[in-house]
Amino acid sequence: MDTVQSLINITLPQPEIEAPAKLEYDRTRILSIAAVVFLGYLLLRPLFDKRLPLPPAPTRLPLLGNLHQFPASNLWGTYKKWHNQYGPIMGLKYGQRTVISLGSHEVAKDLLEKRSNIYSSRPNFVVAKAFSNDANSALIAYDERWKTHHSLLSTFMNARMAAKYQFLQNIESKQALHDLMSVQGTEWMQVFHRYTISVTFTLAYGERIPELYDERILFIDELTETISSNVEKPKNLIADCFPTISILPSALMRWKKQGKVYHDSAMKFFLDNHAKALQKPGWNWVKESQTSEDANKLDREEVIYLIGVLIEAGGSTMKTFEFFVMASILFPEKVRLVQEEVDRVVGADRLPTWDDSPNLPYLHAFIREVQRWRPIFPFGVPHSNLKEDVYNGFRIPKDSVVLANHWAMDSDHKVFENADDFVPERWLEDSKLPFLAFGYGKRVCPGQHIAKRSLFIIISRTLWAYNITHAYEKGKKVEIDPHAIVQNILAGPVPFKGTFTPRDADRYRILEEEFSNIGQDEANIWDVCKP
């Protein structure tokens, strides 16, 4: 046996120590060669690509596409300039992403409405999905799950239910009008913010938020700011431009951990308020969801998140209120026309109501012009196409990010004469002008019926009650820059100061009386608002 073992040892020597190093060297060579081949493929592919071209755009570089041209500032203005140069549809490349920007109403309608079966999905934004755990109805793909979400939301937000909610909007607007009596500086912004949050919070959870700086409002603000700042961070945008790198571990992709922390924090807030809502004596969205067939098709936590995130979404109307105040200060001659109409129809001894709406055409034109002049979603909410498509000889690859460029469309001089000017009359002179504030096709804003009533009730009553003018400091007028806009996904003006002065003593008295009666009406909210 020892002899056999000796022979084996002689004929089968031990592996050399250098073998692992040699193996590592070979692996490195193979990876290097593969990388060179892949890079060469990417560089040479366009030369042999026989497919239809993408829509025109600034010159693209291999791998990067148009990343080197991504505007560091004035994003919307740059896109509009590009549309003027390249036409109403552009095909940009940001890394692995294809971005199709639609710069005219005609093209947007052709694709997002006439071909809505293709263009009703959402892009797979990996960072945003990490922060929502892929449960935000506004961001999920167009599939059976989205249809269930949409059906559930429709039970809360359809036109019939929105008509019932005006009782609550009436109460909340009276509080807002009273709060405006004592605000200073930029605090008026918080008045409208409280209004929008309290309306949706009351409907969702059965409890009003009467205080301007309630801790729940501050927490919702923190949630909104956290997700906005993280989604728009340049280093996080890289993950959306090159989504394949999202497979890397959390240690390298910090947004994964940040997204989980954010989602857990949001869910705790939603869970706590969801549980409280079930114990409320009156009706609310949480209770309504308990008997919904659509809710039963979804996970419990998904339903809780779906309802909770509506509070944040409802707050977006606040940005339109802020632009309304800006327009009121900058264009007082237009405000006087609104006030003359409201005084003629309503009089001076009561607040406007929704019943007055059909008789206030100039007011409606004024509101529409605010939404056109300063759209709060300058790029809309991005769509995505479920399959490759061809439009006017251009190829639109599957899963493209399709932007309805509201900023370019709403300032298109071919459609809106003197588009840079604030002209409410245009909506009275041409009823066929395109209006896109609430989106396109099957992904229109599900809360639009509630939002329209909120805009009417707040704006009509504010202009009935107040003159809105520049603020003064040390005897000097504080100027407002109409172009000072925060360039986020949701756009709003840079905070500015304004002055709200009751138009006369009688209106001041009426505001006080209406505010004092809120307590009597509050007890009836949930009986009036329920189906």
Curated annotation (Swiss-Prot):
Subcellular localization: Membrane
GO molecular function: heme binding; iron ion binding; monooxygenase activity; oxidoreductase activity, acting on paired donors, with incorporation or reduction of molecular oxygen
Record-level GO cellular component terms: membrane
Reaction it catalyzes: silphinene-15-oate + 2 reduced [NADPH--hemoprotein reductase] + 2 O2 = gamma-lactone-2-keto[5.5.5.5]fenestrane + 2 oxidized [NADPH--hemoprotein reductase] + 3 H2O + H(+)
A GO BP entry: mycotoxin biosynthetic process
Key words of the record: Heme, Iron, Membrane, Metal-binding, Monooxygenase, Oxidoreductase, Transmembrane, Transmembrane helix
Membrane topology: Single-pass membrane protein
Record note on disruption phenotype: Abolishes the production of penifulvin A.
InterPro entries: Cyt_P450, Cyt_P450_CS, Cyt_P450_E_grp-I, Cyt_P450_sf, Cytochrome_P450_fung
Gene3D superfamilies: Cytochrome P450 (1.10.630.10)
Transmembrane segments: 30-48
Protein residues bound to heme: 445
Broadest EC class assigned to this enzyme: oxidoreductase
PROSITE patterns to which the protein is assigned, alphabetical: CYTOCHROME_P450
EC number(s) on file: 1.-.-.-
Pathway: Secondary metabolite biosynthesis; terpenoid biosynthesis
Cofactor(s) required for function per UniProt: heme
SUPFAM superfamilies: Cytochrome P450 (SSF48264)
Function statement: Cytochrome P450 monooxygenase; part of the gene cluster that mediates the biosynthesis of penifulvin A, a potent insecticidal sesquiterpene that features a [5.5.5.6]dioxafenestrane ring.
Similarity-based family: Belongs to the cytochrome P450 family.
Name of the protein in its database record: Cytochrome P450 monooxygenase peniB
Species this chain originates from: Penicillium patulum (Penicillium griseofulvum)
